[in-house]
């Protein structure tokens, strides 16, 4: 059962929204790592999920750079 955000949801976002989601995910990962270091983290699996979401966002951005994916709302 997948808990993270599927890649198709990221593909529906435009560039600004992707960058925003990426920054939010990076901030969450930082906070989770801080909680892990202080022993306050209750859900260790969330670390893996956030890392994978970050990787999915980078993948979608790279697909668009290579022209493998179309930006939603862009005219062909």
From Swiss-Prot:
GO molecular function, one term: structural constituent of ribosome
Keyword Ribonucleoprotein: yes
Coiled coil region boundaries: none
The keyword Ribosomal protein is annotated on this UniProt entry: yes
One BP term from GO: translation
Keyword tags: Ribonucleoprotein, Ribosomal protein
Disulphide bond pairs: none
Any one cellular-component term (Gene Ontology): cytosolic large ribosomal subunit
PROSITE patterns noted in UniProt: RIBOSOMAL_L29 (PS00579)
Similarity remark: Belongs to the universal ribosomal protein uL29 family.
Name used for this protein in its record: Large ribosomal subunit protein uL29
UniProt source species: Corynebacterium glutamicum (strain ATCC 13032 / DSM 20300 / JCM 1318 / BCRC 11384 / CCUG 27702 / LMG 3730 / NBRC 12168 / NCIMB 10025 / NRRL B-2784 / 534)
Phylogenetic classification of the source organism: Bacteria, Bacillati, Actinomycetota, Actinomycetes, Mycobacteriales
Protein's gene: rpmC
């Amino acid at each position: 059962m997948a808990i993270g955000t599927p890649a198709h949801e990221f593909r529906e976002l435009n560039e600004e929204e992707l960058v925003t989601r990426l920054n939010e995910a990076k901030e969450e990962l930082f906070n989770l790592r801080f909680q892990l270091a202080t022993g306050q983290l209750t859900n260790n699996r969330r670390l893996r999920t956030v890392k994978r979401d970050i990787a999915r966002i980078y993948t979608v951005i790279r697909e668009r750079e290579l022209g493998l994916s179309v930006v939603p709302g862009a005219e062909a």
